[in-house]
């Protein structure tokens, strides 16, 4: 059975989101430069939210405050690469957390207006999630 994956849709404010923090992959070569939501695999005996906080610390050197879970229209986790499924939560940077810093997993972090998330070069499965985040926040990407 494939491992489960978690990701954070980090917005500028859980109360009034207008921007999404998008992360460009550093590797593997076929995904380098493509954007994704930060996160990663759930370790054995680890709860999903524990994994989410750990992954954000490891990938971004920061901390988050977690909000509502973002589900598919069917109310399930999101299907992603290699037959895995991903749980996604809205989040914002924790009040006293340092700004995210690059540490090798990503080549760039970019705050993107929610109505423009579809203008980035996303890993295919993450584009639909980013657009769902935008729509649930009251924005309608052009879906170019």
Name the predicted role of every residue range.
Residues 1-20, 41:
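Conserved N-terminal beta-strand and adjoining loop/helix that marks the start
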Residues 17-62:
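Conserved Nudix-box catalytic region and its N-terminal flanking loop in Nudix hydrolases
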């Amino acid at each position: 059975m494939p491992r489960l994956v978690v990701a954070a849709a980090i917005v500028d404010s859980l109360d009034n989101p207008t921007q999404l923090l998008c992360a460009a992959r550093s590797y593997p070569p076929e995904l380098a430069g493509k954007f994704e939501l930060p996160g990663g695999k759930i370790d054995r005996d680890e709860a999903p939210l524990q994994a989410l906080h750990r992954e954000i610390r490891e990938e971004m050197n920061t901390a988050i405050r977690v909000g509502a879970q973002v589900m598919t229209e069917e109310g399930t986790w999101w299907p992603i690469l290699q037959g895995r499924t991903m749980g996604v939560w809205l989040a914002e940077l924790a009040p006293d957390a340092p700004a995210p810093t690059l540490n090798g997993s990503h080549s760039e972090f970019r705050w993107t207006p929610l109505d423009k998330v579809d203008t980035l070069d996303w890993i295919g499965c993450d584009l639909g999630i980013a657009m769902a985040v935008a729509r649930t926040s009251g924005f309608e990407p052009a879906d170019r």
